[in-house]
């Protein structure tokens, strides 16, 4: 009899739970050996990876995937190099598991502290990019978590080929194959099953479009680490250094248009707008950025700026489009960001310490920056190494989620025959 999707996913979940107990007690050396061996297996399997990827690319073209999607799907030599290097980099990161902090004696004589431990089983749901398979598997493995990976159907052959390399690495290190499992079925019911198994899955991390993440957030029966939007702002304060403001606002928008930490709205104090906006508009024009502005912005810059609608202030474009608004005060800037933003990443450009401190305190975002581009909101730039994603939630992790974000803490208590009286 054919196994149902629910039975198949339950089998994966049960195996992952058992593997998670082995991983939780695995040594750092053992985990690093698995990562290094997986990197070597990827390097040796380049031809196999390319052949599998060609099947996915052919299927994508037949199904009408656009050029951008096909580009994200492709396993080029550069992408494969990046996956290999990513595994090796994660192997060099400090292992957070087992670290004990805040040990202190209580009046009763016991010692109390906190020990960092894995979450258990992490379910990853993602679209298109096969390299996410490596990113997610490596971080989960190093942090002592078993993982179940459900990639997009368009990348099924690539993900299976990558998974075989990871399995070789696990075997060489003496770790269970179920520590990293790739869902082999393309049936969408597998996603519904994965997010509905609290007995076997401890947390879900979705990576993909807003529709996917909204669905998972709505339907999941296990905790979700996610962000829905990247509506990031740069506010140019009255006390800003003009050169810094221009450099930061340029980089925050034009270094790359698609990432979630790209600026979507530029806020400028009206008292410095004449110095900042005209040169910035010329830069944006040369780089093909469409500008949409408030009435005062259009009065200053002219008809080349389209009229911004109310919807523009709350839109993540992921494209060469920028909204611009002139404001009268820092208060207005903070109110605008907290009203329209997505609590992802927001920056102020200012030489005024008091304004900077107010911005840090009152802007309710996962990353708040002073005199720096929003493009720095990234696990690598924060010294976390690789990241599994960025969270705009306040529980359990917030901001770029690296190794530590895939762990929890438990209290540990040391006594010497102590009893409570």
Swiss-Prot record:
<keyword id="KW-0641">Proline biosynthesis</keyword>
<dbReference type="InterPro" id="IPR016163">
    <property type="entry name" value="Ald_DH_C"/>
</dbReference>
<comment type="function">
    <text>Catalyzes the NADPH-dependent reduction of L-glutamate 5-phosphate into L-glutamate 5-semialdehyde and phosphate. The product spontaneously undergoes cyclization to form 1-pyrroline-5-carboxylate.</text>
</comment>
<dbReference type="InterPro" id="IPR016161">
    <property type="entry name" value="Ald_DH/histidinol_DH"/>
</dbReference>
<keyword id="KW-0560">Oxidoreductase</keyword>
<dbReference type="GO" id="GO:0004350">
    <property type="term" value="F:glutamate-5-semialdehyde dehydrogenase activity"/>
</dbReference>
<keyword id="KW-0028">Amino-acid biosynthesis</keyword>
<dbReference type="InterPro" id="IPR000965">
    <property type="entry name" value="GPR_dom"/>
</dbReference>
<dbReference type="InterPro" id="IPR015590">
    <property type="entry name" value="Aldehyde_DH_dom"/>
</dbReference>
<comment type="similarity">
    <text>Belongs to the gamma-glutamyl phosphate reductase family.</text>
</comment>
<dbReference type="Pfam" id="PF00171">
    <property type="entry name" value="Aldedh"/>
</dbReference>
<comment type="pathway">
    <text>Amino-acid biosynthesis; L-proline biosynthesis; L-glutamate 5-semialdehyde from L-glutamate: step 2/2.</text>
</comment>
<keyword id="KW-0521">NADP</keyword>
<dbReference type="InterPro" id="IPR012134">
    <property type="entry name" value="Glu-5-SA_DH"/>
</dbReference>
<dbReference type="GO" id="GO:0005737">
    <property type="term" value="C:cytoplasm"/>
</dbReference>
<keyword id="KW-0963">Cytoplasm</keyword>
<dbReference type="GO" id="GO:0055129">
    <property type="term" value="P:L-proline biosynthetic process"/>
</dbReference>
<protein>
    <recommendedName>
        <fullName>Gamma-glutamyl phosphate reductase</fullName>
        <ecNumber>1.2.1.41</ecNumber>
    </recommendedName>
</protein>
<dbReference type="InterPro" id="IPR016162">
    <property type="entry name" value="Ald_DH_N"/>
</dbReference>
<dbReference type="GO" id="GO:0050661">
    <property type="term" value="F:NADP binding"/>
</dbReference>
